[in-house]
Curated annotation (Swiss-Prot):
It comes from Drosophila virilis (Fruit fly). The gene is exu. Keywords: Developmental protein, RNA-binding. This is Maternal protein exuperantia. InterPro entries: Exu, Exu_RNase_H-like, RNaseH-like_sf, SAM_Exu. Residues 420-437, 464-476 have a biased composition (Polar residues). Residues 387-397 have a biased composition (Basic residues). Residues 202-233, 386-477 are annotated as: Disordered. The keyword RNA-binding applies. One of its GO terms (biological process) is bicoid mRNA localization. Transmembrane segments: none annotated. Residues 218-233 have a biased composition (Basic and acidic residues).
Length: 486
């Protein structure tokens, strides 16, 4: 970690080219000078350029900034799950609510939050008047944070003021890729675990010769630190911004014995400098991304059936649209190719896309051919049926030998749905005979009023007494009618 007293302004010298990994695109470097490194991250309503910022956060060893923003649109389900924030409406008012604490979050409008962010950056730069500007550090596999920030600034006419202070964006993902090559995922959480484990191993080796009391106190301190890190929720932009700075600092000082020295920040800047670029390059890329967005939207009718099925096929549709747009294709261009050369032309056009596998290319060719050909029906994605339904699993008795069913709790019997699940599961199947509860091992239910009550006995005895004391029946004689005579 970095001590608060360390000044984050370091003179950038010539970059060490040995830290750049082979195969990583190295852009035009930032001119040499004194720069302030600030880690930045955002929470958004989604992962599209048309989405909005929900939280804007920045971190330095000496200061930090965080502000929630009230968006016009709601967060999509994935964003709500990741950030644990949702939009609620009370009357005519909309507000943000935390799904962890169930409390209302104080938020501002986007223009007010951006103004506060620019004021904070200007104040940070004014504390170091000899600096040449600020470099914003972020960490993500696919570049998205700079585009969202720049687009919001362009929307409110604040880009000129922003470029006077901020000189570059730099992605620490490239640094992680060049520093740690034996891992599959380069997420902040995974990198933090790897670096923490390496730090613990080094500390354990150094403390082998210490006393038992000292080692026990050190282990307790490490456990408390790990528990604190587990409690931090990385779905928040403020937590990720701090984690981005600390992870990048440790990656650039893997061989350093004093990671909290002023030399550590110098190593961090020198390691990141090959991946920096002037802010004007990001603005141009934003314009290109807007063109790509229009191309992606043109493919919406093609992948309409994909978006109506499972999440897996929706993700594949998004991937296909992005790849086609980045390679300069839109629906009109591919339609012209199919009109001229049919399916063979589509196959030849997609062969140049190196980021797609052979089976993905074949799937795209068949899908586009079925869409353009009026004699064919647009292909629908194949959905694999589930093996066993959940209802069948619930109805199937699975008793272990020697274990009675009476020991099972109500939650095991009816699931987490409570009374609702119990009422649903108690409905018998009309196609089968309802099993007896005794045969299934359940406790037999006691019938109501199974014991004759005293009141019932008295009523029955009174009825029998009345029947016995009744007088005998009287037999009436049979009268014979007599006919009258003259």
């Amino acid at each position: 970690m970095v001590a608060v007293s360390i000044d984050s302004v370091i003179d950038i010298s010539a970059a060490d080219q040995s830290t750049a990994a082979s195969g990583v695109a190295i852009k035009d470097e930032l001119p040499n000078g004194d720069y302030i490194l600030v880690a930045v991250d955002i929470d958004t309503t989604g992962r599209r350029l048309i989405d909005e910022i929900v939280q804007l956060a920045a971190y330095t060893p000496t200061d930090h900034f965080e502000q929630y923003i009230m968006p016009y649109m709601n967060l999509n389900p994935a964003a709500r799950q990741r950030h644990q924030v949702r939009v609620i409406s009370i009357g005519f008012f909309r507000m943000l609510k935390s799904m962890q604490t169930y409390k209302i979050i104080k938020s501002k409008s986007e223009v007010a939050a951006l103004k506060d962010f620019l004021d904070w950056l200007d104040q940070l730069k004014s504390k170091n008047p000899n600096t040449d500007g600020i470099v914003l550090l972020y960490h993500e596999e696919r570049k998205f944070i700079p585009y969202m920030i720049l687009q919001s600034l362009v929307k409110y006419g604040m880009l000129d003021r922003f470029t006077k202070t901020v000189k570059s964006f730099v992605n620490s993902f490239n640094l992680a890729k060049s520093s740690i090559g034996d891992t599959k995922h380069y997420s902040l959480r995974n990198l933090s675990k790897i670096l923490s484990k390496a730090k613990e191993d080094n500390a354990r080796v150094d403390n082998d010769n210490e006393a038992d009391s000292n080692s026990s106190s050190a282990d307790k301190h490490v456990k408390n630190g790990l528990q604190k890190e587990r409690d931090e929720f990385d779905g928040s932009a403020s937590v990720r911004a701090k984690l981005t700075f600390n992870v990048a600092l440790q990656l650039s000082n893997l061989d350093s014995t004093e990671p909290e020295s002023s030399e550590a920040l110098s190593n961090l800047f020198n390691a990141l400098k090959p991946f920096t670029e002037a802010i004007s390059g990001d603005v141009k890329e934003l314009d290109t991304q807007n063109v790509h967005l229009e191309r992606q939207n043109s493919f919406r009718p093609v992948f309409l059936n994909y978006f109506k099925t499972t999440l897996y096929h929706r993700v594949r549709a998004v991937k296909f649209r992005i790849v086609l747009a980045e390679n300069g294709f839109d629906l009109t261009t591919l339609n012209d190719i199919w009109t001229e050369k049919r399916i063979e032309g589509l196959d030849a056009a997609l062969q140049g896309i190196a980021s797609l596998k052979a089976e993905d290319k074949n799937e795209l060719v068949e899908l586009l051919d079925s869409f353009f050909d009026p004699a064919k029906v647009t292909i629908k994605p194949i959905i694999k049926p589930s093996t066993i339904r959940r209802r069948n699993k619930r109805n199937t008795p699975a008793h272990k030998p020697g274990v009675g069913s009476g020991s099972r709790s109500a939650s095991d019997e009816f699931g987490a749905g409570g009374d609702k699940s119990q009422s649903v599961s108690s409905v018998p199947d009309s196609t089968t005979k309802t099993p007896s509860p005794i045969k299934n091992g359940g406790r037999p239910q006691r019938k109501r009023n199974s014991r004759p009550s005293l009141h019932t006995k008295e009523v029955k005895s009174a009825e029998s007494a009345l029947n016995n004391t009744a007088p005998a029946s009287i037999s009436l004689p049979n009268y014979v009618p007599i006919a009258a005579t003259n």
